[in-house]
Structure formats: structure tokens, C-alpha cells
């Protein structure tokens, strides 16, 4: 098995020029000189890698030897330069003004002089051909200048005391490398980018320390592979992500000396045909040692199977838990990637089983027959044990089979629906795999008007135990959820008690899903750009929604309306009546034109899309260009571009693009400048109010305690004179 993309580098230091400075006396001049480094990087070497279902190898090495490029180019050090001949302006006996000085040894300076010193702009040429053009200050290259070597290599940028210091660009003709960025005392240090070939397919952009890649940076290799993360001494070290484009693999996690070591996640992407759908990608998350899976880790297989346990040198070894595609579970000892004991059941078959061991009454489900293969396939075992428990034990197997047959009749459509909704909000994917999330599943339920059967979306989610809208759903889980929802909605309308699960599922498919699926509504997923922009605020909105749910046992439309009032967001554009009409588009039960019901519970998707609706109502149109602040030439250029674009684009597309840009600006303005700042201010005010109230309570308590103590002391003082008199009389 190949190790993961190691990067070797020499520890050779990059010597920088020594400088010599000699002050001139009327007829002598001195100059700082330096030797300039020619930076390079190594070749992008690759070796073969083997990938299999059980043991997937890590990607090849990308060795990066650093050698000849970082050797210095020595420039003569000028210890004492005597002017043999001078041609130019003078002031008295001093060189002053423009002139040409010919130095002993064949060196020449042409440029500005001031009181006998090279000062101002000039050109200095060494006898070996090295040339400096730029600023001089008191005989020293200082400011901005250009070094040019005899072979054509150049440095252009800031110079301090004759050394590259500041921002500059170095081009090496021999190695075709280019560095552009910050320098410190002649060495690459700070932010900079290095291109290692003429095609600019091999480069590094990031932080440098002492001529080495160190800190945070991004490295693109000639093969197209990319690493972005932390570096130390020219090798990957710390947290980082490496993507092997040629192998469709990615590792994200910890690195030590160029090798995957510590905690990390390795993903194997899978290409698929347009009509196929894998549940997920092969992905390992856990411990790595020397680029191998070693220690504790979890492997998610693309088929839906899952292994969680111990690993040793890339193989399952030790105690582990394996969940098969059909939901069966084996827990025990593994040895060299194999189960130490064959499980008591047939892993590839599925009958009336309990796919998840944490379901209630799993022993009953496990006792059912598993000798017959499921018509849906071994990877599509339904998890509806909670519904089967409502059926008499004698009829459970028949009920389960009839549900499977009902699902089988619609399997093609169900797969299309899963693929369609899982791709909402995604423009592209490296592996074309989009696991469905609960947020997308919520959109599917709203599109199919499932919530219009006397049950809210939030109540539906309580039935299937949803804890996060961003959790992925496997196809078998998605179908199981639909069956559970169908039963709770339709079972009262089914007269016969026989095959009731299949009847409820078929009714929901016929009345709701088939006519309405894939007709996307709402503010979030109606356009890919809408989702791309809005999802930037989903995490923060989820935090706010959770906080509101904690504050209220049930978060309803009424609480949402009052929240906007507390945040002082209502104005002429955003009013309560407009808000209610917007919310009732997806949920007609909120407002039927005459009556309003504000006590309906809101799910997170409804909450998030309600915020997006508020952004549309409240947002003002933002112009892309402010013509009052744009000069005439730029206006003419913009006008010509607009005319050219209009010629290529139809009026309908131009209008749609304008509307889309307007929506993006309004959404960003609402969240960044209105809603989120107002909510954060409200939280701070509440915290400060609570703190002040707590301080007031504390002070009041202290005052009561002090008063009580004073009263006790006063009661004690009334007895003190008697005691004193007694003592005095004794004396």
C-alpha cells in the first residue's frame, strides 16, 4: 500500500549575501552587494495505488526534494572601490549631479551623485555583468530597485541596505521559477507565492519563514493534486487537507513531517452514471499512523455498511462493530480484516429484521424469518419496526411483505425523488454523490403538501426523531420515513385493517407525492444561487432557532412574529400582514384569507425560509455601480460592456440575472446588517439585564442580611449594660 503523499526536503539553508560598505572621500565610492538565492521546488513524483472494497490504499507520494534551486548565486563583495575616472557634474571637488564613475576592477556606476556619494537613482554594473538599477542612498542600494544577473535572472522590488527586504519578485531563468511576495533580510519571509514551472501548474501560495514554506499555505502540484493547510520546514505539518485529483481521494486532518499522522478523515470519491445513486462515499474517520489506518476508527462504505472499531496497519483488527447494508449487526473480534467468527445470520439476506438495535422490542423483529431475500435488495431493508409493533404478531410478516411490494412498484420514482432533492443547492460535486439531508427532506414534504393533513412539519419530525436538519439520510431511511408518515396521516381513513401499512403508503403516494414531487417551492431551494447564498447563514440561523426552542416549549408562528417585533424589524416594507401572507404561501393553515392561526409550530426549514421571505420584503434594491462616484471613462467602459452583454443575452435572461443579483444583495443586507446584528444586540441586552437584575438581587440580599445582623447586634447590646455593671461591681 502506498504511503500518503510524503514531501521530502533538504534542510539546506539558503545563504544570503554579505554586504560591505565603504564611505567615499571625494574620489572613492562604495556599494553594498548581495548574493541572490534561486528558489526551486522538486518534481511531482507519483506511484501507483490500489483501491479495493475492504482495504483502500492511500494515495502515492508527491516527493518534493529541494536542492539545486536554493543554492545561492554569489555576487562579489566590494571592500574598497576606487574611482579611476569620473565623467559628469561636480560641485567644487565633489561629485554632484548626474555622472558616470569608472571604478577600479571594471565596475561602473551611472546615475545621481550628491556631495561625492551615490545618492538617488542610478545603475551599478559589476565587472562580472551583475547589474543593479534603482534607488541609492548614501552609497547604499536603498528603496526600490532591480537586480539583473548575466543569465537573465532578475529581482525587482524593495531593497534595504542592498538586501532584498520588503515586497519584491524574483525570476530565475535557469529553473523557470518565480517568487512574488515578502522578503526579510534577503530571505523569503511572510506572505508570498512561488511558481515552480513556466506553465504555472505547480505553485505555492502562503506563508514563508527563513526561505521555507512554514505556516498556512496552499500547494498545487503539476499533477493537479492540491494541499492546503499548515507547513513546517517545507513539509506538510499540522492541520491540512490534501486532494488527489487523479485518484479521486481526499485526506483532511493531522500531518507530521509530510505524512498523515493523528486524527483525520480520508474520503474515496466514487463516480457514477447519471441514473445511479450511491448512498454515500467510502470514508474513514479516525486514527492514522504513518499514513495507515491504525488505532480507533470508523469506516463508512458507499453501499451503506458501517464498521466502527479497532484498526491495525490498514486492516480491521481487534474489537469492532459492523453494520451490514441490510441493517444486520455483527459485534465482536476482527482479525486481519476478517471477522474472527462468522455471524449467526446470513449477512446478505433481509427479512423482517430490526435494522437498528436501539429500536424497541428488537428481539421480536430479529426472530422473524430471514431466509427470504427482500424484493427491494439487501441494501434497502425498511426500518418500520415501530409500526409493525402495532400489528398483531401473526400478521406482521404479511404486512411487511405487502409494504415492500408497494414500495417496489414506486421504486423508480422514489430513487428519482431522492436524487433530485439531494442535489438541491449543489451546483457540482467531484463524485456526483449528494446524500439527502433532513433540510432537503423537509422541502420534499412541504412540496408534497404532507403538512396539510392536520399535522405540522415539526410534529412529523418528532415522529421520526430528527435532531439536526443537516444530518444525512440514506435511501432506505428516506423510504422508511415516508411509510411512517403515511401511516400517521392516513390510517384513520383506511377502512380495512389488513395490509394497512401498504394501503397508507399507496394513498400518500397517489394523492400527494406523485402529483407534487419535484415541483420545488419556497425561498431556499428554488434556485441554486439562492441556496448557495442563503446557506452561508444556515448555521447561525440554526443556533438562533435552537435558542428560541429552548426559551419556548413550542416555537410557533406567533413567537416568530413577536421575535421580529422585539428586534424592531417592522417598517413600511416589512409589516405583520405582509409577513402572514408570505408564510401562508407554503402553509395555508396559517391564513386562509379571513382567519389566521398563529399557534402552528414551526420547523427549522419554515423558520429559515421565513427569514428569507423577510429579506425579500425588507430589502432595498442595491445598485451595482454608483454613477455619481464613477469617472466618465469608467462609465463609458461599463456602458460598452453592458451593450456587448445585451447583444449576447436575451432580454429575459438579462432580467432574470438582474433579479437574481438583486435577491442576493437583499439577502446579504438583511442578514449581515439587519437581522443578525439586531439579534446579537438583543442577546447582549438580555444578558446585561440579567446581570444587573442578579446584582440588584445580590445587593438586596446583602442589605437584608446586614439589617438582620444589625438588629441582632442591637438586641445583644440591650443586655450588655447589665453584664458590664456586674463585672464592675465584682472588681
Curated annotation (Swiss-Prot):
Could you state one GO cellular component term attached to this entry?
Answer: cytoplasm
Question: What keywords are annotated for this sequence in UniProt?
Answer: Cell projection, Cilium, Cytoplasm, Cytoskeleton, Flagellum, Repeat
One family from Pfam that matches here is: MORN
Q: What is the superkingdom listed in this entry's lineage?
A: Eukaryota
Does this UniProt record's set of keywords contain Cytoplasm?
A: yes
Q: Where located?
A: Cytoplasm, Cytoskeleton, Cilium axoneme; Cell projection, Cilium; Cell projection, Cilium, Flagellum
The answer to whether UniProt assigns keyword Isomerase to this entry is: no
Name where it mostly resides: cytoplasm
Output compositional bias ranges, type Low complexity: 18-36, 46-57, 363-377
* SUPFAM superfamilies noted in UniProt: Histone H3 K4-specific methyltransferase SET7/9 N-terminal domain
Where do the MORN repeat units fall?
A: 86-108, 109-131, 132-154, 155-177, 179-201, 204-226, 227-249, 251-273, 284-306, 307-329
Q: Where is this region: Disordered?
A: 1-69, 353-377, 709-731
Bias category Polar residues: which stretches? 7-17, 722-731
Function, as annotated, reads: May function as part of axonemal radial spoke complexes. Radial spoke complexes are important for ciliary motility.
What name does this protein carry?
Radial spoke head 10 homolog B
Lineage of source species: Eukaryota, Metazoa, Chordata, Craniata, Vertebrata
Name of the encoding gene: rsph10b
